[in-house]
Amino acid sequence: MSAGKIIQIIGAVIDVEFPQNAVPKVYDALKVESGLTLEVQQQLGGGVVRCIALGSSDGLKRGLKVENTGNPISVPVGTKTLGRIMNVLGEPIDEKGEIGAEEYWAIHRAAPSYEEQSNSTELLETGIKVIDLICPFAKGGKVGLFGGAGVGKTVNMMELIRNIAIEHSGYSVFAGVGERTREGNDFYHEMTESNVLDKVSLVYGQMNEPPGNRLRVALTGLTMAEKFRDEGRDVLFFVDNIYRYTLAGTEVSALLGRMPSAVGYQPTLAEEMGVLQERITSTKTGSITSVQAVYVPADDLTDPSPATTFAHLDSTVVLSRNIASLGIYPAVDPLDSTSRQLDPLVVGQEHYDVARGVQGILQRYKELKDIIAILGMDELSEDDKLVVARARKIERFLSQPFFVAEVFTGSPGKYVSLKDTIRGFKGILDGEYDHIPEQAFYMVGSIEEVLEKAKKM
């Protein structure tokens, strides 16, 4: 193991000088005598390497001794990681002792080759009406939850984890990338209460941590998920939030001496996203189904970060502030959300027709809103009045009480099977429930509950 010394410190970026004949390779992990781990990013020539600190650089000084480990960062993988909380280096942060894993894998790995990849069209039922109907998930697919600040990305993700972990008995890996520590804590307790903690590995690099941790923690979580996949399992990989992964790259990019690109993002934005996303894939041995929350800065979906993420996804669930302001949760926009699976060959003709019918009525209602605002409801034709009435029922029926939000709402959570979802919306489209007041459709599960609620009104 060769040794060098620190010659420059600028925030999270540190230059280390080594003997000319023992310069570390890019992505090698270096250990400072204070215990801090660095990751080599660039070789500057003259034996100097530029590194990112994976931890706080407080208290470092020039001249400190640095040793080259000769390998990339390696993290524990396998069943020993289940039920544990780890940091970017795979070290436990839950005060439950050592992980005790038999195997350690490097976090930088090649994506599966073209021959190894598999394509599946099997659907994954989530129990959330709007998602199962409008933007169904594929097993082994990639899903993005897009939304601005405070529209419910994390709550939706927690509900998905709860529903899928209870209904589907596979393992999950959760990577908390630059999110609030409070949410990480809530999440841990939610998993404990639902009795699914022993099926989840948690990897956290939260908001208060240096950019190096936030940049690499997604790869740490992904490496653990890849191990489960390569053992022949179907694994779920949750990332909250993919935007902070991009942001961490932006923070270190300028310090690494790169010119910024559009909106100040790093010039390597598309490549960094591709390196992560191409590894999140299903092979012939097992599958990784990933759900990624994507923060949308200033609700602008054309921002380079969310726009780059769109290209990699099979299903996009767009959360809308307008729908949240109506008090309809989950605030999924049924006209903006899409899925590659919404195809009659995959979901069947009935599901496809009902989903398109729902979107058609909501689109017509959106067009009529301007007329209603200026002239009022009375000026509409009878057909349009019927469209508006049904659209308002559909809007309300797309809401649903969540299990993870029971504490806040006071109403018990509901899991609705895909069969019941299609039957309910088909009934509304066919006019079977035209006589029922729209309030009865708000915050319920299946259509039977609507009829029960209507009787009490």
Curated annotation (Swiss-Prot):
The text of the family note is: Belongs to the ATPase alpha/beta chains family.
Report the function annotation for this chain: Produces ATP from ADP in the presence of a proton gradient across the membrane. The catalytic sites are hosted primarily by the beta subunits.
> In the UniProt record, what gene is named as encoding this protein?
atpD
Its keywords, alphabetically, are: ATP synthesis, ATP-binding, Cell inner membrane, Cell membrane, CF(1), Hydrogen ion transport, Ion transport, Membrane, Nucleotide-binding, Translocase, Transport
Instruction: Name the PROSITE patterns for this protein.
Output: ATPASE_ALPHA_BETA
Keyword Ion transport assigned to the entry: answer is: yes
Which cellular component terms (GO) are annotated to the entry? Answer: plasma membrane; proton-transporting ATP synthase complex
Provide the assembly information. F-type ATPases have 2 components, CF(1) - the catalytic core - and CF(0) - the membrane proton channel. CF(1) has five subunits: alpha(3), beta(3), gamma(1), delta(1), epsilon(1). CF(0) has three main subunits: a(1), b(2) and c(9-12). The alpha and beta chains form an alternating ring which encloses part of the gamma chain. CF(1) is attached to CF(0) by a central stalk formed by the gamma and epsilon chains, while a peripheral stalk is formed by the delta and b chains.
Q: Which GO terms describe its molecular function?
A: ATP binding; ATP hydrolysis activity; proton-transporting ATP synthase activity, rotational mechanism
User: What residues does ATP bind to?
Assistant: G147, G148, A149, G150, V151, G152, K153, T154
Task: Enumerate the PANTHER family for this protein.
Answer: ATP SYNTHASE (PTHR15184), ATP SYNTHASE SUBUNIT BETA, MITOCHONDRIAL (PTHR15184:SF71)
Subcellular location(s) of the protein: Cell inner membrane
Q: What is its main location?
A: membrane
Q: Which reaction does it catalyse?
A: ATP + H2O + 4 H(+)(in) = ADP + phosphate + 5 H(+)(out)
Question: Which organism is the protein's source?
Answer: Histophilus somni (strain 2336) (Haemophilus somnus)
CDD domains for the chain: ATP-synt_F1_beta_C, ATP-synt_F1_beta_N, F1-ATPase_beta_CD
One short Pfam family name for this protein?
A: ATP-synt_VA_C
Cite the source lineage: Bacteria, Pseudomonadati, Pseudomonadota, Gammaproteobacteria, Pasteurellales
Q: How does it sit in the membrane?
A: Peripheral membrane protein
Protein name (database record) = ATP synthase subunit beta
Enzyme Commission number(s) of this protein: 7.1.2.2
Stored InterPro entries: AAA+_ATPase (IPR003593), ATP-synt_VA_C (IPR055190), ATP_synth_F1_bsu (IPR005722), ATPase_a/bsu_AS (IPR020003), ATPase_alpha/beta_chains (IPR050053), ATPase_F1/V1/A1_a/bsu_N (IPR004100), ATPase_F1/V1/A1_a/bsu_N_sf (IPR036121), ATPase_F1/V1/A1_a/bsu_nucl-bd (IPR000194)
